[in-house]
A protein has these predicted regions:
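Extended surface/linker regions that mediate inter-domain or inter-protein docking
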Residues: 1-17, 25, 132-216
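Catalytic cores of secreted or luminal carbohydrate-active enzymes
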Residues: 78-153
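Short, surface-exposed linear patches
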Residues: 42-44, 93-97, 103-104, 188-193
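Inter-heme linker and motif-flanking segments adjacent to c-type heme-binding CXXCH motifs
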Residues: 1-92
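General N-terminal targeting signals
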Residues: 37, 97-98, 182-187
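Low-complexity, flexible helical/coil segments
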Residues: 55-59, 107-111, 203-207
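Residue-identity detector for glutamine
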Residues: 30, 40-41, 96, 133, ...
Length: 216
């Protein structure tokens, strides 16, 4: 859909005829944008102010908001405008032989290999103070099974001068973990002994964790 998007879907591509690389430029595969690696280090970013400056509005009172509110907070009030996006994924229900039904958007609510899904359209983002950096869950990090595990932990707070209120898509789900060692398990999904052949979580987790040299 981004080959020829409407102005409502993408104002730069739909109205101005931009190509992806006009914003996501770079050299030697160092593409501008918030990848997992660059987001952790807070480098290689670009934003609206790189083209529009931090005083883009005719009304000066609106420009005062740019000190604490990211441009996207107002200018991207919803996402998944034309196609549904997955917002929940429950691996714990995988492996069942049950009837697969589509939701109101025509998307599958279940897949035997992957479990239950929830899809949404015209989603209102969730908002967080963010300074452009993040921490990530690393393989083998200990978890508390009683709490929600954040795989992407955004940095920033109201007292951080580099933080702004920023919109995010939050993906929630359930996945397997090692109840003895209290870390997330990495199952082998495909190939010999993989979960998609055996539908045996323990066997698949053992093989997967062996591949990253961790006990299961």
């Amino acid at each position: 859909r981004l080959l020829n998007p409407s102005e409502e879907l993408d104002v730069h591509m739909g109205r101005a005829g931009f190509e992806c690389s006009e914003c996501h430029a770079g050299e030697s595969h160092q593409i501008l944008g918030a990848s997992h690696g660059s987001l952790q280090q807070g480098t290689n970013h670009f934003g609206c102010v790189d083209c529009h400056t931090d005083e883009p509005h005719v009304k000066k009172i609106l420009n005062k908001h740019t000190n604490s509110i990211a441009c996207e907070t107002c200018h991207i009030p919803t996402f998944a405008k034309e196609m549904a996006t997955k917002t929940y994924w429950d691996w714990s229900t995988a492996g069942q032989d049950k009837k697969v039904e589509n939701d109101e958007f025509g998307m599958p609510k279940y897949a035997k290999k992957k479990g239950d899904f929830v899809w949404e359209m015209n989603v209102i983002p969730e908002y967080s103070w963010h300074n452009g950096q993040a921490d990530y869950y690393k393989i083998g990090d200990e978890i508390n099974p009683e709490n929600v595990v954040k795989l992407n932990n955004l940095k920033g707070n109201i007292n951080d001068p580099n933080s702004k209120i920023t919109p995010f898509k939050v993906m929630r789900g359930k996945q397997i973990y090692d109840s003895k060692n209290n870390y997330l398990a990495i199952p082998k999904l495909f190939g010999k002994g993989g979960y998609w052949k055996t539908y045996d979580w323990n066997a698949a987790a053992k093989l997967g964790m062996e591949s990253v040299s961790l006990e299961y």
